[in-house]
Amino acid sequence: MKQRMSYCNGTLKKLIFVLILAYGAVNFSQAGVLAGRNIDDKLIKFDVFLGSKKVGFHTFYFEKVGKELHVKSEANMTFRVFLFKNIKYLHEANEVWQDNCLLKFSSKTIKGDSELSVEGKNFGDKFIVSNLSGENQFSGCVRSFAYWAPELLEAEELLNVENGVLVPVKVDKQPNHNESGYSATINLPKSKIDLKYQDDDNWIELETNLKLLGKLRYKKVVT
């Protein structure tokens, strides 16, 4: 039983990690804020599946405020672990971007009986992240896992806004054979996340494998 619970805890950590990274799916035109683009979509929703079962949704809201891009994320999911325990996951986060860098963010995550709040803000050439455990300080341009602008993923490290930790990444892109668009893989230290985009860089799908639980998949809801 101890070994089973150890696997369970590890799987839950990866599941929550993947969920918290899913930060937006927005279609842009060729002029405006952030990487020279404007927002076309104001609200985008993803259905979330674990295996073949729908376990919840993740909704994203986008707003241009002057030179800033404001992104709000809300997730609500319930999934079962080893057929005997339901886990409730609730998440809300707010990010503010400018000039391809994160200006500030705040996040609140409830998973089961635990709750975590984190916030961060740019101060000149420093980005300070704080939570109940203290502060972390980073230098230079900080970026989170901005799936909605794939060029922003091309960095050596990306910020996990759930816990305020910079994660080493390597991104590989490849064309989709026999269909339009392209795919991208975010290689993490112990796992990977596969993404699908349309030709206009519109993010439409996410997939990753969770040990013992199966495939986690985000699928964009077409309205």
Where is each model-derived feature located?
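Short acidic/polar alpha-helix capping motifs at helix-coil junctions
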Residues: 23, 55-58, 157-158
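Solvent-exposed helix/loop surface patches that form functional interfaces
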Residues: 39-41, 106-213, 218-220
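N-terminal mature ectodomain segment of secretory-pathway/periplasmic proteins
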Residues: 40-44, 48-122
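Bacterial N-terminal signal peptides
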Residues: 16-27
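Ligand-binding grooves and catalytic loops that recognize ribose/phosphate and carbohydrate rings
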Residues: 223
